[in-house]
């Protein structure tokens, strides 16, 4: 009996544990994991592009715009007052002059800064020639349609910018109200336009760029501004178009116009 028990115990001690079956790695499983990883990376990129990146790009655009304004202010300092003004005199009227028309800029060449009080006190987006993404819209901000008028010139001064991504300069274009100031600053001074109306068109509606928007073969007698961007948000199926009319040109020697500091009602 004891030998029998010993024999069984010896057999039990020499037994090896069964090896667990190896998990087979299937091709479908690998593909699934790769797709999940790619999806996470894509999601992170979208979050960066639409939110985090926009905040960074927007701040950079405004900083560059303010730097341009400051550099022009240093080049054209305001004249020093020779005497204190007489309190009995009526306040001075805003100083305006005949607009100084710039030459059309080359693709990607900066020429101005756009200020829109409705969009905030710090809104100061650089403007450059051309409307290509690679040269102007992505790296700079607002682009001028080649062949259209320049600021203050009779006809249609037409510009474009992103509504989403890359700092989204025209993100709030639909918030404009009748009478809102749209101020274009150049080294010569400030061109003030007043917003009039919005329109939604198809992407091929190039008539909005005519000297008189939407009017073929009509000679211009007014100075317009036309701002275009994609619509609806995150889509390119339509274009949103904002129109404005010219109000005044303020030479740099006269100081910034009051329109720049208007409170958005």
Place the predicted regions along the sequence by residue.
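Terminal targeting segments of Actinobacterial cell-envelope proteins
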Residues: 1-28, 78
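Solvent-exposed, non-transmembrane regions of membrane-associated and secreted proteins
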Residues: 23-24, 29-30, 37-265
